[in-house]
Protein backbone atom coordinates (compact mmCIF):
# COMPACT_ATOMS: atom_id res chain seq x y z
CA UNK A 1 0.00 0.00 0.00
CA UNK A 2 2.44 2.59 1.23
CA UNK A 3 4.80 2.03 -1.64
CA UNK A 4 2.41 2.90 -4.47
CA UNK A 5 3.90 5.50 -6.73
CA UNK A 6 0.97 7.86 -6.42
CA UNK A 7 1.04 8.03 -2.64
CA UNK A 8 3.04 10.73 -0.96
CA UNK A 9 4.71 9.91 2.34
CA UNK A 10 3.41 11.56 5.52
CA UNK A 11 6.36 13.78 5.68
CA UNK A 12 5.61 15.09 2.21
CA UNK A 13 2.01 15.72 3.18
CA UNK A 14 3.24 17.26 6.37
CA UNK A 15 5.50 19.69 4.53
CA UNK A 16 3.46 20.19 1.33
CA UNK A 17 6.53 18.78 -0.39
CA UNK A 18 7.05 17.65 -3.93
CA UNK A 19 8.77 14.28 -4.17
CA UNK A 20 11.74 14.40 -1.84
CA UNK A 21 14.28 11.82 -0.83
CA UNK A 22 14.49 10.63 2.78
CA UNK A 23 17.15 13.16 3.76
CA UNK A 24 15.19 16.09 2.36
CA UNK A 25 12.04 14.88 4.08
CA UNK A 26 13.86 14.57 7.40
CA UNK A 27 15.23 18.09 6.95
CA UNK A 28 11.87 19.65 6.06
CA UNK A 29 10.11 17.97 8.99
CA UNK A 30 13.00 19.15 11.18
CA UNK A 31 12.52 22.67 9.89
CA UNK A 32 8.84 22.50 10.84
CA UNK A 33 9.73 21.35 14.37
CA UNK A 34 12.35 24.13 14.66
CA UNK A 35 9.68 26.69 13.80
CA UNK A 36 7.27 25.42 16.46
CA UNK A 37 10.11 25.41 18.99
CA UNK A 38 11.25 28.95 18.20
CA UNK A 39 7.67 30.22 18.35
CA UNK A 40 7.18 28.57 21.74
CA UNK A 41 10.39 30.09 23.16
CA UNK A 42 9.32 33.55 21.97
CA UNK A 43 5.83 33.16 23.50
CA UNK A 44 7.34 32.09 26.83
CA UNK A 45 9.49 35.23 26.75
CA UNK A 46 6.47 37.42 25.92
CA UNK A 47 4.48 35.89 28.78
CA UNK A 48 7.46 36.01 31.17
CA UNK A 49 7.14 32.31 31.97
CA UNK A 50 9.78 30.61 34.12
CA UNK A 51 11.43 27.47 32.75
CA UNK A 52 9.09 25.31 34.86
CA UNK A 53 5.99 27.25 33.77
CA UNK A 54 7.09 26.95 30.15
CA UNK A 55 7.25 23.18 30.50
CA UNK A 56 3.72 23.00 31.90
CA UNK A 57 1.57 21.16 29.38
CA UNK A 58 -1.50 23.30 30.17
CA UNK A 59 0.42 26.45 29.19
CA UNK A 60 1.60 24.71 26.04
CA UNK A 61 -2.00 23.88 25.07
CA UNK A 62 -3.12 27.49 25.55
CA UNK A 63 -0.26 28.85 23.43
CA UNK A 64 -0.84 26.25 20.69
CA UNK A 65 -4.53 27.08 20.69
CA UNK A 66 -3.86 30.80 20.38
CA UNK A 67 -1.78 30.41 17.23
CA UNK A 68 -4.28 27.98 15.68
CA UNK A 69 -7.05 30.46 16.38
CA UNK A 70 -5.00 33.34 14.96
CA UNK A 71 -4.66 31.48 11.66
CA UNK A 72 -8.23 30.16 11.45
CA UNK A 73 -9.23 32.43 8.58
CA UNK A 74 -12.70 31.05 8.05
CA UNK A 75 -13.64 31.44 11.70
CA UNK A 76 -12.01 34.87 11.87
CA UNK A 77 -14.08 35.99 8.89
CA UNK A 78 -17.22 34.56 10.49
CA UNK A 79 -16.50 36.39 13.76
CA UNK A 80 -15.99 39.66 11.89
CA UNK A 81 -19.34 39.28 10.13
CA UNK A 82 -21.34 38.00 13.14
CA UNK A 83 -20.10 40.04 16.08
CA UNK A 84 -21.12 38.45 19.39
CA UNK A 85 -21.20 40.24 22.71
CA UNK A 86 -18.00 40.03 24.73
CA UNK A 87 -15.94 38.43 21.96
CA UNK A 88 -13.35 40.54 20.22
CA UNK A 89 -12.81 38.90 16.80
CA UNK A 90 -9.33 40.39 16.56
CA UNK A 91 -8.07 38.92 19.83
CA UNK A 92 -7.19 35.47 21.08
CA UNK A 93 -6.10 34.16 24.46
CA UNK A 94 -6.65 31.66 27.22
CA UNK A 95 -5.53 30.61 30.67
CA UNK A 96 -1.83 30.78 31.58
CA UNK A 97 -0.77 29.15 34.82
CA UNK A 98 1.94 30.67 37.00
CA UNK A 99 3.52 29.65 40.27
CA UNK A 100 3.00 32.47 42.82
CA UNK A 101 3.86 32.09 46.53
CA UNK A 102 4.00 28.28 46.34
CA UNK A 103 0.55 28.17 44.72
CA UNK A 104 -0.65 27.83 41.14
CA UNK A 105 -2.50 30.88 39.84
CA UNK A 106 -4.58 31.15 36.68
CA UNK A 107 -4.12 34.28 34.61
CA UNK A 108 -6.33 34.96 31.58
CA UNK A 109 -4.33 36.55 28.78
CA UNK A 110 -5.48 38.29 25.61
CA UNK A 111 -3.37 39.04 22.52
CA UNK A 112 -4.00 40.55 19.11
CA UNK A 113 -4.25 37.76 16.56
CA UNK A 114 -2.15 39.94 14.26
CA UNK A 115 0.63 39.98 16.88
CA UNK A 116 0.52 36.18 17.32
CA UNK A 117 0.67 35.74 13.54
CA UNK A 118 3.71 38.04 13.43
CA UNK A 119 5.52 36.04 16.14
CA UNK A 120 4.68 32.74 14.41
CA UNK A 121 5.88 33.94 10.99
CA UNK A 122 9.02 35.39 12.49
CA UNK A 123 9.80 32.02 14.11
CA UNK A 124 9.21 30.35 10.73
CA UNK A 125 11.44 32.56 8.54
CA UNK A 126 8.55 34.70 7.39
CA UNK A 127 6.38 31.78 6.19
CA UNK A 128 2.85 30.91 7.27
CA UNK A 129 4.28 27.44 7.97
CA UNK A 130 0.95 25.65 7.61
CA UNK A 131 2.66 22.30 8.20
CA UNK A 132 3.56 23.36 11.74
CA UNK A 133 -0.01 24.47 12.40
CA UNK A 134 -1.37 21.15 11.15
CA UNK A 135 1.15 19.34 13.33
CA UNK A 136 -0.27 21.06 16.42
CA UNK A 137 -3.83 20.27 15.30
CA UNK A 138 -2.91 16.59 15.07
CA UNK A 139 -1.37 16.69 18.55
CA UNK A 140 -4.62 18.15 19.91
CA UNK A 141 -6.61 15.56 17.99
CA UNK A 142 -4.49 12.70 19.38
CA UNK A 143 -4.97 14.07 22.89
CA UNK A 144 -8.74 14.18 22.38
CA UNK A 145 -8.74 10.63 21.00
CA UNK A 146 -6.97 9.42 24.13
CA UNK A 147 -9.08 11.42 26.57
CA UNK A 148 -12.63 11.11 25.28
CA UNK A 149 -14.82 8.41 23.86
CA UNK A 150 -17.03 9.74 21.07
CA UNK A 151 -20.10 7.69 22.01
CA UNK A 152 -22.62 10.43 21.45
CA UNK A 153 -21.23 11.48 18.07
CA UNK A 154 -21.29 7.85 16.93
CA UNK A 155 -24.86 7.27 18.06
CA UNK A 156 -26.04 10.51 16.45
CA UNK A 157 -24.84 9.39 13.03
CA UNK A 158 -26.37 5.95 13.41
CA UNK A 159 -23.17 4.11 14.25
CA UNK A 160 -22.39 1.93 17.25
CA UNK A 161 -20.28 3.22 20.20
CA UNK A 162 -18.31 -0.01 20.04
CA UNK A 163 -16.85 1.23 16.76
CA UNK A 164 -14.74 3.81 18.60
CA UNK A 165 -11.50 2.32 17.26
CA UNK A 166 -12.42 3.82 13.86
CA UNK A 167 -12.75 7.37 15.17
CA UNK A 168 -9.17 8.61 15.09
CA UNK A 169 -9.00 12.31 14.21
CA UNK A 170 -12.72 12.89 14.74
CA UNK A 171 -12.05 16.30 16.33
CA UNK A 172 -9.61 17.52 13.66
CA UNK A 173 -10.70 20.79 12.04
CA UNK A 174 -11.65 20.66 8.37
CA UNK A 175 -8.69 22.82 7.43
CA UNK A 176 -6.11 20.23 8.47
CA UNK A 177 -5.15 19.43 4.87
CA UNK A 178 -3.59 16.25 3.46
CA UNK A 179 -1.67 15.46 6.64
CA UNK A 180 -4.94 15.67 8.58
CA UNK A 181 -6.79 13.47 6.08
CA UNK A 182 -4.07 10.82 6.38
CA UNK A 183 -4.59 10.38 10.13
CA UNK A 184 -8.39 10.26 10.05
CA UNK A 185 -9.95 6.89 10.83
CA UNK A 186 -12.54 5.19 8.63
CA UNK A 187 -15.28 6.03 11.15
CA UNK A 188 -14.33 9.70 11.13
CA UNK A 189 -14.61 9.91 7.35
CA UNK A 190 -17.91 8.00 7.40
CA UNK A 191 -19.26 10.36 10.03
CA UNK A 192 -18.30 13.45 8.02
CA UNK A 193 -19.97 11.99 4.92
CA UNK A 194 -23.15 11.01 6.79
CA UNK A 195 -23.45 14.51 8.24
CA UNK A 196 -23.14 15.90 4.74
CA UNK A 197 -25.76 13.54 3.29
CA UNK A 198 -28.15 14.33 6.15
CA UNK A 199 -27.85 18.04 5.42
CA UNK A 200 -28.66 17.27 1.80
CA UNK A 201 -31.75 15.32 2.83
CA UNK A 202 -32.98 18.16 5.03
CA UNK A 203 -32.03 21.08 2.80
CA UNK A 204 -33.24 20.89 -0.80
CA UNK A 205 -30.70 23.45 -2.00
CA UNK A 206 -27.66 21.84 -0.43
CA UNK A 207 -26.48 20.20 -3.67
CA UNK A 208 -27.87 22.91 -5.98
CA UNK A 209 -26.57 26.07 -7.54
CA UNK A 210 -23.08 27.53 -7.43
CA UNK A 211 -22.53 26.47 -3.80
CA UNK A 212 -23.90 23.02 -4.52
CA UNK A 213 -21.14 22.47 -7.05
CA UNK A 214 -18.52 23.18 -4.38
CA UNK A 215 -20.42 20.95 -1.97
CA UNK A 216 -20.50 18.15 -4.51
CA UNK A 217 -16.79 18.31 -5.19
CA UNK A 218 -16.09 18.30 -1.45
CA UNK A 219 -18.34 15.23 -1.14
CA UNK A 220 -16.50 13.42 -3.91
CA UNK A 221 -13.12 14.39 -2.49
CA UNK A 222 -14.08 12.98 0.93
CA UNK A 223 -15.35 9.79 -0.73
CA UNK A 224 -11.99 9.40 -2.48
CA UNK A 225 -10.07 9.92 0.76
CA UNK A 226 -12.17 7.21 2.42
CA UNK A 227 -11.85 4.91 -0.59
CA UNK A 228 -8.07 5.26 -0.38
CA UNK A 229 -8.13 4.01 3.20
CA UNK A 230 -9.78 0.69 2.30
CA UNK A 231 -7.54 -2.23 1.45
CA UNK A 232 -9.97 -4.53 -0.39
CA UNK A 233 -11.43 -4.18 -3.88
CA UNK A 234 -15.02 -4.78 -2.74
CA UNK A 235 -14.88 -2.02 -0.13
CA UNK A 236 -13.43 0.36 -2.72
CA UNK A 237 -16.06 -0.56 -5.30
CA UNK A 238 -18.74 0.22 -2.75
CA UNK A 239 -17.14 3.63 -2.17
CA UNK A 240 -17.30 4.30 -5.92
CA UNK A 241 -21.05 3.62 -5.73
CA UNK A 242 -21.44 6.05 -2.84
CA UNK A 243 -19.39 8.70 -4.63
CA UNK A 244 -21.21 8.44 -7.95
CA UNK A 245 -24.70 8.56 -6.46
CA UNK A 246 -26.80 11.22 -8.22
CA UNK A 247 -28.64 12.26 -5.11
CA UNK A 248 -27.03 10.88 -1.95
CA UNK A 249 -29.59 9.75 0.63
CA UNK A 250 -30.45 6.97 3.04
CA UNK A 251 -29.16 4.21 0.77
CA UNK A 252 -25.72 5.83 0.85
CA UNK A 253 -25.88 6.26 4.63
CA UNK A 254 -26.66 2.53 4.93
CA UNK A 255 -23.75 1.67 2.67
CA UNK A 256 -21.37 3.89 4.65
CA UNK A 257 -22.41 2.38 7.99
CA UNK A 258 -21.98 -1.08 6.47
CA UNK A 259 -18.48 -0.12 5.34
CA UNK A 260 -17.61 1.33 8.75
CA UNK A 261 -18.65 -1.92 10.42
CA UNK A 262 -16.68 -3.96 7.91
CA UNK A 263 -13.60 -1.89 8.79
CA UNK A 264 -13.60 -3.41 12.29
CA UNK A 265 -12.34 -6.61 10.66
CA UNK A 266 -11.12 -5.50 7.22
CA UNK A 267 -9.23 -2.55 8.65
CA UNK A 268 -8.47 0.60 6.71
CA UNK A 269 -5.06 2.26 6.33
CA UNK A 270 -4.79 5.10 8.79
CA UNK A 271 -1.56 7.01 9.32
CA UNK A 272 -0.06 7.47 12.77
CA UNK A 273 2.48 10.08 13.74
CA UNK A 274 3.96 11.11 17.03
CA UNK A 275 3.10 14.80 17.40
CA UNK A 276 4.41 16.27 20.65
CA UNK A 277 3.31 19.39 22.54
CA UNK A 278 5.14 22.63 21.72
CA UNK A 279 6.66 22.67 25.24
CA UNK A 280 8.77 19.65 24.20
CA UNK A 281 10.12 21.27 21.03
CA UNK A 282 10.78 24.68 22.64
CA UNK A 283 13.33 23.61 25.28
CA UNK A 284 15.05 21.28 22.77
CA UNK A 285 15.56 24.19 20.35
CA UNK A 286 16.58 26.46 23.24
CA UNK A 287 19.27 23.96 24.26
CA UNK A 288 20.83 24.42 20.82
CA UNK A 289 19.53 21.31 19.04
CA UNK A 290 19.11 21.98 15.32
CA UNK A 291 16.22 19.83 14.08
CA UNK A 292 16.62 20.87 10.45
CA UNK A 293 20.32 20.02 10.39
CA UNK A 294 19.93 16.76 12.31
CA UNK A 295 16.72 15.74 10.52
CA UNK A 296 13.56 14.47 12.18
CA UNK A 297 10.85 11.90 11.49
CA UNK A 298 7.41 11.64 13.07
CA UNK A 299 7.23 7.90 12.46
CA UNK A 300 10.61 6.62 13.61
CA UNK A 301 12.80 6.76 16.71
CA UNK A 302 13.09 10.58 16.88
CA UNK A 303 9.99 11.37 19.00
CA UNK A 304 10.95 8.57 21.41
CA UNK A 305 14.48 9.94 21.79
CA UNK A 306 13.14 13.46 22.27
CA UNK A 307 10.74 12.32 25.00
CA UNK A 308 13.53 10.34 26.76
CA UNK A 309 15.31 13.66 27.32
CA UNK A 310 12.38 15.99 28.00
CA UNK A 311 10.89 17.30 31.22
CA UNK A 312 7.18 18.05 30.93
CA UNK A 313 4.95 18.96 33.86
CA UNK A 314 1.21 18.92 34.34
CA UNK A 315 -1.27 20.35 36.80
CA UNK A 316 -2.91 17.60 38.84
CA UNK A 317 -6.35 17.82 40.47
CA UNK A 318 -6.70 16.66 44.10
CA UNK A 319 -7.95 13.12 43.40
CA UNK A 320 -6.03 12.40 40.22
CA UNK A 321 -3.21 9.90 39.88
CA UNK A 322 -0.08 11.46 38.28
CA UNK A 323 0.95 8.09 36.79
CA UNK A 324 -2.43 7.84 35.08
CA UNK A 325 -2.13 11.39 33.76
CA UNK A 326 1.28 10.41 32.38
CA UNK A 327 -0.18 7.39 30.59
CA UNK A 328 -2.87 9.54 28.99
CA UNK A 329 -0.33 12.02 27.61
CA UNK A 330 2.14 9.28 26.59
CA UNK A 331 -0.55 7.57 24.52
CA UNK A 332 -1.52 10.90 22.95
CA UNK A 333 2.11 11.67 22.06
CA UNK A 334 2.31 8.44 20.08
CA UNK A 335 -1.15 8.56 18.55
CA UNK A 336 -1.93 5.28 20.29
CA UNK A 337 -5.50 5.66 21.57
CA UNK A 338 -6.74 2.64 19.61
CA UNK A 339 -3.68 0.41 19.81
CA UNK A 340 -3.60 -2.91 21.65
CA UNK A 341 -2.82 -2.23 25.33
CA UNK A 342 -0.63 -5.32 25.64
CA UNK A 343 1.68 -3.98 22.96
CA UNK A 344 1.66 -0.49 24.49
CA UNK A 345 2.59 -1.93 27.91
CA UNK A 346 5.49 -3.77 26.30
CA UNK A 347 6.82 -0.69 24.47
CA UNK A 348 6.35 1.64 27.41
CA UNK A 349 7.79 -0.81 29.91
CA UNK A 350 5.00 -0.17 32.42
CA UNK A 351 1.43 -1.42 32.47
CA UNK A 352 -0.93 0.58 30.29
CA UNK A 353 -4.48 0.44 31.65
CA UNK A 354 -7.88 0.91 29.99
CA UNK A 355 -9.34 4.44 30.07
CA UNK A 356 -12.05 3.51 32.55
CA UNK A 357 -9.48 2.38 35.12
CA UNK A 358 -7.54 5.66 35.03
CA UNK A 359 -8.04 8.13 37.86
CA UNK A 360 -7.57 11.17 35.70
CA UNK A 361 -9.70 13.62 33.79
CA UNK A 362 -8.57 15.51 30.71
CA UNK A 363 -5.39 17.57 30.62
CA UNK A 364 -7.16 20.90 30.22
CA UNK A 365 -8.43 22.70 33.29
CA UNK A 366 -11.84 24.37 33.04
CA UNK A 367 -12.10 28.06 33.91
CA UNK A 368 -14.36 27.36 36.90
CA UNK A 369 -12.07 24.83 38.58
CA UNK A 370 -10.57 25.79 41.89
CA UNK A 371 -6.83 26.53 41.63
CA UNK A 372 -6.17 26.49 45.39
CA UNK A 373 -5.99 22.71 45.52
CA UNK A 374 -3.98 22.25 42.28
CA UNK A 375 -0.64 20.52 42.51
CA UNK A 376 1.74 19.81 39.67
CA UNK A 377 3.87 16.81 38.86
CA UNK A 378 6.29 15.51 36.25
CA UNK A 379 4.78 13.56 33.37
CA UNK A 380 6.63 10.29 32.80
CA UNK A 381 6.80 10.14 29.00
CA UNK A 382 9.78 7.83 28.56
CA UNK A 383 9.62 4.39 26.97
CA UNK A 384 11.47 1.09 27.27
CA UNK A 385 11.52 0.38 23.53
CA UNK A 386 10.60 2.18 20.34
CA UNK A 387 8.74 0.96 17.26
CA UNK A 388 7.94 2.22 13.80
CA UNK A 389 4.50 3.80 13.34
CA UNK A 390 2.31 2.15 10.73
CA UNK A 391 0.02 3.57 8.10
CA UNK A 392 -1.66 0.27 7.36
CA UNK A 393 -4.43 -1.46 9.25
CA UNK A 394 -2.53 -4.73 9.29
CA UNK A 395 -4.25 -7.89 8.16
CA UNK A 396 -7.10 -9.29 10.11
CA UNK A 397 -7.85 -12.07 12.52
CA UNK A 398 -9.95 -12.76 15.50
CA UNK A 399 -9.75 -12.80 19.24
CA UNK A 400 -11.89 -12.18 22.29
CA UNK A 401 -12.48 -8.47 22.71
CA UNK A 402 -14.57 -6.45 25.07
CA UNK A 403 -17.93 -4.90 25.69
CA UNK A 404 -16.55 -1.42 25.08
CA UNK A 405 -14.23 -1.43 22.11
CA UNK A 406 -14.43 -4.41 19.80
CA UNK A 407 -11.43 -3.90 17.55
CA UNK A 408 -8.10 -2.08 17.45
CA UNK A 409 -6.48 0.26 14.93
CA UNK A 410 -2.76 -0.50 15.09
CA UNK A 411 -0.30 2.36 15.70
CA UNK A 412 2.96 0.42 15.69
CA UNK A 413 4.30 -1.89 13.04
CA UNK A 414 4.95 -4.83 15.37
CA UNK A 415 4.14 -8.52 14.91
CA UNK A 416 1.03 -9.68 16.80
CA UNK A 417 -2.49 -10.82 16.14
CA UNK A 418 -5.02 -8.02 16.15
CA UNK A 419 -7.92 -8.55 18.52
CA UNK A 420 -11.51 -8.09 17.47
CA UNK A 421 -14.68 -9.77 18.56
CA UNK A 422 -15.86 -11.57 15.46
CA UNK A 423 -19.20 -12.75 16.79
CA UNK A 424 -20.15 -9.26 17.96
CA UNK A 425 -19.10 -7.67 14.69
CA UNK A 426 -20.74 -10.29 12.50
CA UNK A 427 -24.01 -10.12 14.42
CA UNK A 428 -24.50 -6.66 12.92
CA UNK A 429 -24.45 -8.06 9.39
CA UNK A 430 -27.82 -9.76 9.26
CA UNK A 431 -30.37 -9.15 6.57
CA UNK A 432 -30.00 -6.40 4.04
CA UNK A 433 -28.03 -7.87 1.16
CA UNK A 434 -30.36 -6.69 -1.60
CA UNK A 435 -30.01 -3.50 -3.58
CA UNK A 436 -27.36 -2.24 -5.95
CA UNK A 437 -24.44 -3.07 -3.67
CA UNK A 438 -25.57 -6.62 -2.85
CA UNK A 439 -22.72 -8.43 -4.59
CA UNK A 440 -20.11 -6.21 -2.95
CA UNK A 441 -21.75 -6.62 0.43
CA UNK A 442 -21.79 -10.39 0.01
CA UNK A 443 -18.11 -10.34 -0.94
CA UNK A 444 -17.20 -8.17 2.07
CA UNK A 445 -19.15 -10.40 4.46
CA UNK A 446 -17.41 -13.46 3.00
CA UNK A 447 -13.98 -11.90 3.58
CA UNK A 448 -14.94 -11.07 7.15
CA UNK A 449 -16.16 -14.62 7.78
CA UNK A 450 -12.85 -15.90 6.44
CA UNK A 451 -10.71 -13.74 8.75
CA UNK A 452 -8.63 -16.19 10.80
CA UNK A 453 -7.73 -15.96 14.48
CA UNK A 454 -4.25 -17.35 14.06
CA UNK A 455 -3.19 -14.96 11.36
CA UNK A 456 -0.34 -12.69 12.37
CA UNK A 457 -0.11 -9.03 11.34
CA UNK A 458 3.18 -7.22 10.61
CA UNK A 459 5.04 -10.54 10.48
CA UNK A 460 8.69 -10.29 11.46
CA UNK A 461 8.36 -6.71 12.67
CA UNK A 462 9.45 -5.96 16.20
CA UNK A 463 10.24 -3.25 18.67
CA UNK A 464 13.77 -1.89 19.10
CA UNK A 465 16.06 -0.95 21.94
CA UNK A 466 16.43 2.83 22.24
CA UNK A 467 20.13 2.39 21.47
CA UNK A 468 19.22 0.70 18.16
CA UNK A 469 18.66 3.86 16.10
CA UNK A 470 19.02 2.13 12.75
CA UNK A 471 16.42 -0.51 13.67
CA UNK A 472 18.76 -3.44 13.05
CA UNK A 473 17.64 -5.90 15.76
CA UNK A 474 13.86 -6.30 15.94
CA UNK A 475 12.57 -7.80 19.19
CA UNK A 476 9.29 -9.60 18.55
CA UNK A 477 7.25 -9.35 21.76
CA UNK A 478 5.20 -12.21 23.13
CA UNK A 479 1.90 -11.38 24.77
CA UNK A 480 -0.31 -12.73 27.46
CA UNK A 481 -3.43 -13.32 25.39
CA UNK A 482 -5.68 -13.61 28.43
CA UNK A 483 -5.29 -9.90 29.04
CA UNK A 484 -7.69 -7.31 27.79
CA UNK A 485 -6.47 -5.48 24.70
CA UNK A 486 -8.92 -2.59 24.37
CA UNK A 487 -8.38 0.86 25.86
CA UNK A 488 -12.02 1.95 25.88
CA UNK A 489 -13.08 -1.34 27.49
CA UNK A 490 -16.60 -1.16 29.01
CA UNK A 491 -15.75 2.41 29.35
CA UNK A 492 -16.75 5.49 31.30
CA UNK A 493 -14.55 8.09 29.65
CA UNK A 494 -16.03 11.56 29.47
CA UNK A 495 -17.70 12.69 26.27
CA UNK A 496 -15.88 15.11 24.02
CA UNK A 497 -17.83 18.35 23.82
CA UNK A 498 -16.77 21.09 21.49
Swiss-Prot record:
This is Nucleoprotein. A motif (Bipartite nuclear localization signal) lies at residues 198-216. The lineage of its organism: Viruses, Riboviria, Orthornavirae, Negarnaviricota, Polyploviricotina. It comes from the Viruses. Residues 8-21 have a biased composition (Basic and acidic residues). Residues 1-21 are annotated as: Disordered. The gene is NP. It is found in: Virion; Host nucleus. Keywords: Capsid protein, Helical capsid protein, Host nucleus, Host-virus interaction, Ribonucleoprotein, RNA-binding, Viral nucleoprotein, Viral penetration into host nucleus, Virion, Virus entry into host cell. It comes from Influenza A virus (strain A/Kiev/59/1979 H1N1).
Amino acid sequence: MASQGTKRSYEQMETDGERQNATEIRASVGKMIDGIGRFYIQMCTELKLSDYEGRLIQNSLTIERMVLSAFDERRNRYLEEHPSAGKDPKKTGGPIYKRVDRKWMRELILYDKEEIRRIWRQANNGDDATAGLTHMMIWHSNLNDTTYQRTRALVRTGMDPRMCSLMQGSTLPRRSGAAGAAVKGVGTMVMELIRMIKRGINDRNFWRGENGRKTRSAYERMCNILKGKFQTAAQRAMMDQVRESRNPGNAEIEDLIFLARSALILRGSVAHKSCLPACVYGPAVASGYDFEKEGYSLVGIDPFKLLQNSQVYSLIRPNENPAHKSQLVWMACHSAAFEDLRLLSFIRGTKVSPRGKLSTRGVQIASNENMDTMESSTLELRSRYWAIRTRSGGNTNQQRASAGQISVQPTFSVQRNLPFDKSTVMAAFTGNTEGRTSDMRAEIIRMMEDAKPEEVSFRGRGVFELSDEKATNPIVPSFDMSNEGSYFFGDNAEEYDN
